[in-house]
Amino acid sequence: MKPKSKVLIIAGSDSSGGAGIQADIKTVTALGSYATTAVTAVTAQNTKGVKKIISIPSEIVQKQITMILDDIGTHAVKIGMLHNTDTIKSVYKTLKRYKSKNVVLDPVMIAKAVSYTHLTLPTILLV
């Protein structure tokens, strides 16, 4: 069965599979679409909490996005955890350069398992 559409997911990886890029892939697939990804961070977490977050360098995130858009393309983009301002700027510039449409921004501000603030509102507004 041919997928209905292609969705680029830009988000962090949740080792427990309950959120982040893993949950987005499950959702996109369940809706009959094809998921591609750009990983922005890797987490060590479970249902009890987030123990560690490692940011993927913004240059790598940008390269993941361009590799997908140059070859596979996308009908929509879903953005989750970006984790730092360099990544936010890089994702914004890359999607703007490719004139990406149908962009859904679902930012992660606080992990539900713990009180972990990724970015403050003033930081986001400066981008």
PLM regions and their residue ranges:
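Single conserved hydrophobic/aromatic residue that forms the stacking wall/gate
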Residues: 118-127
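Small-residue (G/A/S/T)-rich helix-start motifs and N-terminal tracts that mark the onset
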Residues: 1-76
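Conserved beta-alpha-beta core of the PfkB/ribokinase-like small-molecule kinase fold
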Residues: 79, 83-119
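Intrinsically disordered/low-complexity terminal segments and short unstructured peptides
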Residues: 36, 93, 122-123
